[in-house]
């Protein structure tokens, strides 16, 4: 019947979306992970040659936005993002399990889990909504929440309960002047450790048959194939919305991690140069 045909169509659309992301992520990330770790090792060696860490500031550059949180350079939030990714991934997995067509219940359940997933990473604030409006077009209405991430990335949900749409925007500027604070020796080591961890996270999230990331979404999507023929159109549409949202969230987190890694490497490099 038409519902079964629509279910199959939506299933193919979801699988296609995830497959494209997985393919792109593997192509881009594989080469970049190696470079990330090599750059971190190289800078670690250079740190050994720095006699004193007396510099208080470093010249600002375009890289500064990549270490910003709500437009302000913030090492603490960069490190926090790296440490909170596992919690986000576990919540994302739970979200997809709840979204399984055979387990579809009241829409409130979905929104609660969806919100919980975002809260693993950040919290919504009026200032984040205000800033996100500058980065995401056509963002208006009362049902808007914005979650800032390190890397100056903003995850936004828009729409009423059970019909929300997730998107994200990037701020390529920030509230800093010609200089920003230099890192201490300890902070340099923390930053490089975080970069290596990001490389490992990227690898595990995009590994074949991985539990999390795009690979994890693909695994869950495969499980719903047969069930998509047995639910009505409204439920199928809800599944489609949920998967599109969780893919957007993965896009946002991947973007934030990538930006933070680049920014941290540049920050350490600038600190070393300022102390030479």
Where are the regions a protein language model picked out?
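Non-catalytic, low-structured ubiquitin/UBL-interacting segments
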Residues: 1-4
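Long, low-complexity or tandemly repetitive, helically biased scaffold regions used
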Residues: 41-276
